[in-house]
Structures are given as structure tokens and as C-alpha cells.
A protein has these predicted regions:
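Structured C-terminal helix/loop/strand segments within mature extracytoplasmic catalytic/sensor domains
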Residues: 10-17, 43, 318-447
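Active-site-adjacent helix/loop patches that line small-molecule binding or acyl-intermediate pockets
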Residues: 96-118, 123-125, 178-299, 307-310
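Active-site SXXK
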Residues: 152, 165-185, 312, 380
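Conserved ankyrin/ankyrin-like repeat signature
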Residues: 452, 484-485, 517-518
Length: 536
């Protein structure tokens, strides 16, 4: 199985650690009631219950440290030792301790989803895809599920680590890559945006002689033709493969050459479709049809497991930013277009029914996988090879129905309000949790953690929110002398003239602390610098 992180150094225990109040407060918060110390196993359990797994790159050093503590037979962590671990990812610790992830009660949610998954295991019917000989060899009893939140909380069930052929799920990412490289106008001159009303491999075009959409074979072949058309075959595929690796946070992604050869040898329909496309001017004049088809078959022959595919889905749910690496892979506009097409066209001839019943973007493949995206919340991948008459996983569809019967994930659940149903929003927040997120923002400002501030603001935290004393994140950053925090807040709409309940502004806090560079920054902003980027 692919490792998402490298091991930490052999000894990561510094001899001196500077303690700050946060460590002591969180140490006490994480201790079990009645205990006088925090054990390495208790800390590991806090991470596990929050959905932060051992192969999460954000927690790599933390788990390595706890493993070494286990090997040393340590039964407790001192506050000083805890500070070492805390310093590896302070913002992650804060959010785990205060249960402020997007799904607050993750362990309860994961247990409930596991029950839905197991109840659908007995769903019978369907047949494993036989028109690609290599796929026909996959055992019909395989069944796996993984989920990943936009905060990187993860859980796996069944055969979630077993590799499967992604097939048509590849169309989503090929479309995203082509869209970013060719641009919206150029790409959609050649590919439409409408459901076709025909089967996924139908030899048909829209009235403008284009494939109806990028989620059917014709559209995906044209998408592939627009990806780095001037590069060599190996360079083009490496580019797509590397993009999948980024989306999966360097998780399990591979290429199955046997599936590729099997698919190419049984691809008469796709060859006919490609030459039909060329006859109707769907390709540029320079396009090599045979090479484009090989490229398309290669993309379909990528293999992943549910674990990695769920991270891909969560990256799309997170607007193109990978929740495990914080790397932006696609622009938010690209993701918006992709999710729109997944919602209307992603499930073959069942797309309309899926949109009506389930109500979230999804893409299936004849390998038995379904990638499901709940925007701003979660990504799922469910895999089971037996397919229904539409080419969708039988157990996968049943799982999705069970999921949305329990949870309010349908895109339009928001308009029903309190309609008497007992469906649950697992991300629902209360006032105390919103207050905790404001505390997170102030903490990040105090420590100069710009990435954490960006994440919190992107998730909806008010940059100008104040505590009961009227103090904002800008007050805190100015008091602590955090120049870059102040700069970020001012550049993003921070109100520099807000006063706390004692009548103090942030600039007065900076003056009192003799933080002269920050005072100068405030002066530049007040005298017209708000129109500039306030660069250092």
C-alpha cells in the first residue's frame, strides 16, 4: 500500500522546549476524566476518533513520535513531551482537542456509515463487466468503501484497500485537466454540456456536431485530445498520472497494463466513435486519432483503491484543495464545472434518477467504483464490481440511497428545512462550536499561522469576529507582534479601527508593545495603503 509520508528522524525529542499556555490547556483538555496525565495511547485514540489516520501527512511526525513512545514502554507524556508533539502541527491539535472539524462527532458518524455499508452488503443482482475481458475476472463479492472529509477525516470499510480499475471515473479528472489547459471557451467549442439521452458509448453528436458532454466516451476522448497535445505519449500520460497522485495525496495509484491491452483489443466501438468524431471535425487537424485513443485507454486503465479515491473526491468537495496536503490541484472554477457535469451526466443513463434521488455529484465506472462528492463536506468512494443494466455498481447505488436516507446530503435539502424528516446533518454546528472556531482564528493569528488563518476564513469564519471583550484576531496579532498575521488580516478586509471594551484599537496594542513595524503597517494602511498589497 502506498505510503503518504516519510518516516521522521530517529530521535525527535529536543532537550529544551518552550512552553506556552496553549500546550498546558490542551494537555488538560485531552486527559481522561479523573486522570493526572495523558498517555501516548490516549493521544493516539483522540486522533483516531477524530478521523486523523496514521498515514495522514499532516500527522506523520506525531504518529511516529507516539510509536517511539510505545517502543520505549512509556505510559504517560509529560507536558514538556506533549509540547514536542504539539509543535509538529499546532492547528491540527487545536481542532482535535476542541472537536472543531467539519464533522464534529466523527466516530459516531463513521459508525453509522459503517452500518449503512454493511446493510447493503447483501444486495444481490448485477453482473461483472464482461465486455473488457480483464475486468470480467474480478470477484463479484468484493465490496469496499472509504470516506474523507474536507478536513481530512477518514474511515475505511470492507475491501477499501483493494485496487480496482477506475474506468470512466477517469473522465472527471481528464476533463478538469483539459479545462485548465485549453480554457472553458475552447474546450466547450468541442464538447457540449448536456445529458445525451443515449448510452455512454453511443455514436451520436449534438446539433453542433460535438459530443454531448465530457462524461461519455465521445466527450472524454475529445478531452484527452486537448491535454498537452504537443507532448510525447509518455509525457502526456505521466502528466495525468501525476495529477491523480496529487489529488490522492500520494496515495495508492497505479497503472494496469493488462487492463489497457485488454481494453484496446476489445475497443471496436471506441475506434468507430473516434473516427466518427474526426469525420465531424470534433478534433483539431493535428490530432492523431490512434494515439489519442491509446491515451484515453491508458487513463481508463489507472487503478486505485477506495481510500485514495475518497481523498480525490474530498479534494473536489474542497474546491480543488487537497485536505491532506493543503495543495491546490485545480482552480475552484474548474471544480465547479466538473461537479456540475457530474451531477447532470455522471451516472450513465441513471444520471437523472441519481440527481433526483441522491442529489449529489457522482461518477461511476464499469470497474464497479462510484466517486461521490458532497460539496464543502465529504468525499466518498464505494466499490463493488456487479453492475446493473445502466453500468452502475448495484451495491454502490444501494449504499448511496441508504446514505441520503439517513443524512441530509441532497443538494436541495436546504429548501425543505424542518420537513418532519429525521435525516441528520453531521456537519451541523452550534454556537459554542462557532465560538471555538473564532478562538482557533485568534490562536492562528497569535502564532503567525497564515495557512490556518486562510483555511478558517475559507470555511466561513468571520475575520472581524470578536470575543466577549470585543477583541478581534487583529487585536491579538498586533499585541503579539505578528507582522504577517496583521498584514494578512488587513489585506483581507480586517477592520483596523475596531476597539475592544476598554476602548483600545489594534494599533494602540501594537504601540503599547513597541511593535514598530506593525505600527508602520497600520499607518500605511490608514493613509491609503488599503489600495495596495501592503508588501513588506
Amino acid at each position: 500500500m502506498s505510503k503518504r509520508h516519510s518516516p521522521a528522524p530517529a530521535d525527535d525529542r529536543p532537550s529544551v522546549v518552550q512552553l506556552v499556555p496553549d500546550e498546558a490547556r490542551l494537555y488538560n483538555l485531552l486527559m481522561e476524566p479523573g486522570e493526572t496525565s495523558l498517555s501516548p495511547e490516549q493521544l493516539r485514540e483522540h486522533f483516531r476518533r477524530s478521523g486523523i489516520l496514521a498515514d495522514d501527512p499532516r500527522a506523520a511526525g506525531i504518529y511516529d513520535y507516539l510509536d517511539k513512545a510505545r517502543q520505549r514502554n512509556e505510559t504517560s507524556l509529560s507536558v514538556t513531551e506533549f509540547a514536542v508533539v504539539f509543535a509538529m502541527n499546532p492547528s491540527l491539535f487545536m481542532r482535535i482537542a476542541e472537536d472543531s472539524m467539519v464533522v464534529p462527532a466523527w466516530s459516531d458518524f463513521a459508525r453509522s456509515v459503517g452500518k449503512i455499508f454493511n446493510e447493503r452488503r447483501s444486495s444481490n443482482g448485477g453482473k461483472v463487466a464482461a465486455y473488457i475481458p480483464e475486468l470480467a475476472r474480478v470477484p463479484a463479492d468484493r465490496y469496499g468503501l472509504s470516506m474523507c472529509s474536507v478536513d481530512g477525516q477518514r474511515a475505511h470499510y470492507g475491501d477499501a484497500q483493494e485496487m480496482f480499475s477506475i474506468q470512466s471515473i477517469s473522465k472527471t479528472i481528464s476533463y478538469c485537466i483539459a479545462l485548465e489547459e485549453a480554457g472553458n471557451e475552447r474546450l466547450h467549442e468541442r464538447i457540449g454540456r448536456e445529458p445525451s439521452g443515449h448510452s455512454f458509448n453511443a455514436i451520436t453528436l449534438d446539433p453542433r456536431r460535438r459530443p454531448h458532454n465530457p462524461m461519455i466516451n465521445a466527450g472524454a476522448i475529445v478531452s484527452c485530445s486537448l491535454i498537452r497535445p504537443g507532448d510525447s505519449a509518455s509525457a502526456r500520460f505521466s502528466h495525468v498520472f501525476d495529477t491523480w497522485k496529487k489529488l490522492a495525496a500520494n496515495g495508492a495509484v497505479s497503472f494496469n497494463n493488462t487492463v489497457f491491452l485488454s481494453e484496446r483489443d476489445s475497443a471496436d466501438r471506441n475506434f468507430a466513435l473516434a473516427y466518427f468524431l474526426r469525420e465531424n471535425g470534433a478534433f483539431s487537424k493535428e490530432t492523431n486519432v490512434a494515439a489519442t485513443l491509446d491515451f484515453y485507454f491508458q487513463c481508463c486503465s489507472i487503478e486505485m483503491n477506495c481510500d485514495s479515491m475518497a481523498v480525490v473526491a474530498a479534494t473536489l468537495a474542497n474546491g480543488g484543495v487537497n485536505p491532506l496536503t493543503n495543495e491546490r490541484v485545480f482552480s475552484s472554477g474548474t471544480v465547479k464545472h466538473c461537479l456540475s457535469l457530474m451531477h447532470s451526466c455522471g451516472m450513465y443513463d441513471f444520471s437523472g434518477e441519481f440527481a433526483f434521488l441522491i442529489g449529489v455529484p457522482a461518477k461511476s465506472g464499469v470497474g464497479g467504483g462510484i466517486m461521490v462528492v458532497v460539496p464543502e463536506k465529504l468525499g466518498f468512494c464505494v466499490w463493488s464490481p456487479p453492475l446493473d443494466e445502466n453500468g452502475n455498481s448495484v451495491r454502490g447505488i444501494e449504499f448511496c440511497k441508504g446514505l441520503t436516507s439517513m443524512y441530509s446530503f441532497h443538494n436541495f435539502d436546504i429548501v425543505t428545512g424542518h420537513d418532519g424528516s429525521e435525516r441528520i446533518d453531521p456537519t451541523r454546528r452550534n454556537v459554542s462550536l462557532d465560538n471555538a472556531r473564532h478562538v482557533d482564528l485568534c490562536w492562528a493569528a497569535m502564532h503567525g499561522d497564515i495557512k490556518e488563518m486562510q483555511r478558517l476564513v475559507a470555511s466561513g469564519v468571520n475575520l472581524n469576529g470578536a470575543d466577549y471583550d470585543g477583541r478581534t484576531a487583529l487585536h491579538i496579532a498586533a499585541s503579539e507582534g505578528k507582522l504577517e498575521s496583521v498584514r494578512y488580516i488587513l489585506q483581507n478586509g480586517g477592520q483596523f479601527d475596531r476597539v475592544d471594551r476598554w476602548g483600545n484599537s489594534a494599533v494602540q496594542d501594537a504601540e503599547r508593545g513597541e511593535h514598530h513595524a506593525i505600527v508602520a503597517l497600520f499607518e500605511a494602511f490608514a493613509s491609503g495603503g488599503r489600495k495596495t498589497r501592503l508588501s513588506a
